[in-house]
Amino acid sequence: MAPPKAASHRPAVRRKKSGTLVDSILDKYLNVRFFKYLLLEPAALPIVGLFVLLAELVINVVVIQRVPYTEIDWVAYMQECEGFLNGTTNYSLLRGDTGPLVYPAAFVYIYSALYYVTSHGTNVRLAQYIFAGIYLLQLALVLRLYSKSRKVPPYVLVLSAFTSYRIHSIYVLRLFNDPVAVLLLYAALNLFLDRRWTLGSTFFSLAVGVKMNILLFAPALLLFYLANLGLLRTILQLAVCGVIQLLLGAPFLLTHPVEYLRGSFDLGRIFEHKWTVNYRFLSRDVFENRTFHVSLLGLHLLLLLAFAKPIWTFFQSYVRLRRIEDQLQPQITQQNLQLKAQKRPKKVEKDKDKDQKKFTTEQQSFLKAFEKSLQKASGGKATPAPAQAEPERYGIHFDRCTQLALLPFFLCNLVGVACSRSLHYQFYVWYFHSLPYLAWSTPYSLGVRCLILGLIEYCWNTYPSTNFSSAALHFTHIILLAGVAKQLIQTMRINNAAKREQQEQQKKLQ
């Protein structure tokens, strides 16, 4: 990679020599080029994200005020928590109108707090606004990840957020516990990418304590731990997750441990066929057949094994780039300080600075390979550096390497969703916010990517599910997985070619 490019990515706009400040602002921002930048350039997502959050605030308020609330599980949640608050710690005795309590202890504590805040669960409108806050907070965390990765154009996220009726319904009209678990999960992902490991492990374990579907991310997290921390520190983080589960479950484990484990972590629970979104075309007998369940579990494990090597390679590349960032960032900071301190240094000082601050050949080749691989993986073209232009400041957007971390996490979750024994409508939040990222991680055309997202939205909005909607959902999952797999193979080839090129350059230097 050539010396770092200027950090600014906004389109250049000619400025008038004279005029008021207002004229200057209008000339700079109220033009077609700037609007195209906001819609198409991933680097503009932090700006666009603010408008998305403000618009979503209005949308959620309108939905709460105008669309009737639908009671499904809220009353049952309150009944289950009321039993706990009355002193019952036997999970087999904690029940609601829809059946026994089947969620871990963190769910009980969170919804017990909501029980008190909402006047024993009677103030549903207040609960709806609390869940609107959960929605906005989670969306902010999701947008932060997308902003770091710079992979998906802003207009895709805008359309995805504004057009999903089902997602808004799940959050503010149904009050399910799935949004709470997913919120904690995205908080954990943000913390992991900030390298705040113990806090991230804490939030991940809390998410599992709300609902077990978060364990679908666990295979990727285990490899991420190992790649970043090594074996001993990985064991420490796993211990953090385990201790939190023990602390959360202590009131139940110390009194009725078997009932707690059987009730909250029941992997063999049979789902009702009438609520399935993905297997409507199967008969009830096949749907509830144990052999069918074991077959899906086997397929899940086989897919995880098939993706294990590229996932591990992605994580290793991510770790190497973070180490390069740690090496180069002090140099970049020093160069920016020098540029700020003096506009035109003397020639002697220039030569001295070049000798001291010049990136090593290994660093340059590694960064060049990284930039090339990410550009090809995202389908983008290299941005030519302006010839003989003196940058205002140096900068390398190292956070773009989060692409190497996010895709494996989202992919593992998608595999789990695709192989699920049954999907209910509220389960859409498990992977909804990762779908644009996954679609843009395929080599498909823009039209095919949008078609995939549109079909998935159609399937989840079809109520009750039909044979066609269930089959279409499986079809889109398969197409999406196949596209991601193809892109992974291409990226692996690019990575291997970059390694060979780097090795050849090192041999020449020797």
Swiss-Prot record:
It comes from the Eukaryota. The gene is Alg3. It is an enzyme of class 2 (transferase). It catalyses: an alpha-D-Man-(1->2)-alpha-D-Man-(1->2)-alpha-D-Man-(1->3)-[alpha-D-Man-(1->6)]-beta-D-Man-(1->4)-beta-D-GlcNAc-(1->4)-alpha-D-GlcNAc-diphospho-di-trans,poly-cis-dolichol + a di-trans,poly-cis-dolichyl beta-D-mannosyl phosphate = an alpha-D-Man-(1->2)-alpha-D-Man-(1->2)-alpha-D-Man-(1->3)-[alpha-D-Man-(1->3)-alpha-D-Man-(1->6)]-beta-D-Man-(1->4)-beta-D-GlcNAc-(1->4)-alpha-D-GlcNAc-diphospho-di-trans,poly-cis-dolichol + a di-trans,poly-cis-dolichyl phosphate + H(+). InterPro entries: Glycosyltransferase_ALG3 (IPR007873). Induction: Down-regulated by bacterial infection in the gut. Disruption phenotype: Pupal lethal. Pupation is delayed by up to 11 days resulting in giant 3rd instar larvae. Imaginal disc cell proliferation is slowed resulting in smaller imaginal discs with aberrant architecture compared to wild type larvae of the same age, however, during delayed pupation imaginal disc cells continue to proliferate unchecked resulting in imaginal disc tumors. RNAi-mediated knockdown in gut progenitor cells results in increased intestinal stem cell mitotic proliferation. This is Dolichyl-P-Man:Man5GlcNAc2-PP-dolichol alpha-1,3-mannosyltransferase Alg3. It comes from Drosophila melanogaster (Fruit fly). It is found in: Endoplasmic reticulum membrane. Residues 337-358 are annotated as: Disordered. Belongs to the glycosyltransferase ALG3 family. Keywords: Developmental protein, Endoplasmic reticulum, Glycosyltransferase, Membrane, Transferase, Transmembrane, Transmembrane helix, Tumor suppressor. One of its GO terms (molecular function) is dol-P-Man:Man(5)GlcNAc(2)-PP-Dol alpha-1,3-mannosyltransferase activity. Residues 1-43, 119-125, 193-211, 255-294, 425-426, 486-510 are cytoplasmic.
